[in-house]
Amino acid sequence: MNVLNIKRVIVVLTMMIASIVSVSAQTAGEYLKITDAVPGGYNFWYFIPEDYKVEQHKMPLVIFLHGASLCGKDLMRVRRYGVLNAIDKGMVIPAFVLAPQNPGGAWSPSKLNDLLEWAKANYNVDSTRVYVLGMSLGGYGTLDFVGSYPEKVAAAMALCGGCSLKDMSGLGKLPLWIMHGTADRAVGVKESKRVVNYLKDNGIDKLLRFDWLEGGNHGVLARLFYLQKTYDWLISHTTNKRKIEDCIDITWDDIKTTYQDMKKMSEDYEHD
């Protein structure tokens, strides 16, 4: 074999290895499509990381609540953007991921709690490390759920949403990060500011972080799902120690360059 052929073989092998590594990174776990598991409840995806399948040790749980554009009865829609889509693109999240689909209307805190209990009953979930992350309609769902069951959630992040609860005092009992763009025309930033002002006015904002992204529109918040810092911040919390992590910052530059750090992701769905 001449030198030229050897070089060609090396190139082909390198490409094959890169392909295997890429596929492995994107499929390092198993997706379960769960329907009718909870009577009258949501259908959902349940992601199981590869290392859990080997060791069966306790793992954190991330609950992802989508926005209005993914509502319906086709579960594949839930993977168009968000946490599961980030995993598909290569994001490594050391946690189970529970991603329900809302058929329409507001998210129900009690139905979400039913899914949380299902996860704890069927998998070795670390109940001290349950996290909730949602955008738009899912941002409302996040605050409504964690405000109703604050003792069950270690930390939450609500993006460009609001809160429907009459009594929002539960939101002051867990680490919470609220983000909203000031140029949001779909859900005005006033919806998030109303929550922040309530917590401040009632002196229960010690576990609160909030950021108003100057000039940010509604869809730009979708980029947070593809940012490693989002998951680092969430998973740094535990219910055993109610203290908010303030050493991890997410800046405008982080958000603007998200798609440069990973592949194009799901820019087409920045309109929820």
Protein language model regions, located:
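Active-site machinery of serine-nucleophile hydrolases
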Residues: 59-61, 65-113
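Short beta-strand/loop motif that positions the catalytic acidic residue
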Residues: 172, 177-180, 184
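A conserved short beta-strand
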Residues: 152-163
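Short beta-strand immediately N-terminal to the catalytic nucleophile in serine-hydrolase-like folds
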Residues: 132-134, 159, 179
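Active-site-adjacent alpha-helix of alpha/beta-hydrolase-fold enzymes
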Residues: 83, 182-208
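A domain-start/cap signature at the N-terminus of enzymes
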Residues: 23-61, 140, 145, 157, ...
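Histidine-bearing beta->alpha loop at or near hydrolase active sites
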Residues: 97, 181, 210-220
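Gly/Ser-rich "nucleophile elbow"/oxyanion-hole loop immediately N-terminal to the catalytic nucleophile
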Residues: 51-57, 106-136
